[in-house]
Amino acid sequence: MVKKNTKVSNKYIIDATAAVNDKIFDVAAFEKYLIDRIKVDGKTGNLGSSVVVSREGSSKIAVIAHIDFSGRYLKYLTKKFLKKHSLRDWLRVVSTKKGVYELRYYNVVVGNDEEEQ
């Protein structure tokens, strides 16, 4: 049994529209962070043509991988970026559909006790 050498191509989108509109999230810094931190064959800075990180519009990042690449790894790197920039307390990473991740605010419900005081 011989395996065919097929080309795998995955596209992942990270949508940070809400955070960018509130001016608390820098898409350019996040794009640079991903380029610096994504590992290919166990090495950072080894993207080459196998992984392409680009900006789509002013608030979306597209990662196109021509190798086996996990969406969970992208989510992990996004969480690390949020933690590094002290945004993890306000934003979370949610998968809205296959290959699409969105940065959303946590739902904070203020109780009646706090409003009266």
UniProtKB/Swiss-Prot annotation:
Membership in a protein family: Belongs to the eukaryotic ribosomal protein eL22 family.
Protein name per UniProt: Large ribosomal subunit protein eL22
Gene3D superfamilies on file: 3.30.1360.210
Natural source organism: Schizosaccharomyces pombe (strain 972 / ATCC 24843)
Any coiled-coil regions, as ranges: none
Lineage: Eukaryota, Fungi, Dikarya, Ascomycota, Taphrinomycotina
InterPro entries linked to this entry: Ribosomal_eL22 (IPR002671), Ribosomal_eL22_sf (IPR038526)
Record has Nucleus as a keyword: yes
Positions of post-translational Phosphoserine modification: S49, S50
Its job: Component of the ribosome, a large ribonucleoprotein complex responsible for the synthesis of proteins in the cell. The small ribosomal subunit (SSU) binds messenger RNAs (mRNAs) and translates the encoded message by selecting cognate aminoacyl-transfer RNA (tRNA) molecules. The large subunit (LSU) contains the ribosomal catalytic site termed the peptidyl transferase center (PTC), which catalyzes the formation of peptide bonds, thereby polymerizing the amino acids delivered by tRNAs into a polypeptide chain.
Gene Ontology CC entries for this record: cytosol; cytosolic large ribosomal subunit; nucleolus; preribosome
Domain of life where this protein originates: Eukaryota
UniProt keyword list: Cytoplasm, Nucleus, Phosphoprotein, Ribonucleoprotein, Ribosomal protein
Record's subunit section: Component of the large ribosomal subunit (LSU). Mature yeast ribosomes consist of a small (40S) and a large (60S) subunit. The 40S small subunit contains 1 molecule of ribosomal RNA (18S rRNA) and at least 33 different proteins. The large 60S subunit contains 3 rRNA molecules (25S, 5.8S and 5S rRNA) and at least 46 different proteins.
The keyword Ribosomal protein appears for this protein: yes
Pfam families: Ribosomal_L22e (PF01776)
Single biological process term from Gene Ontology: cytoplasmic translation
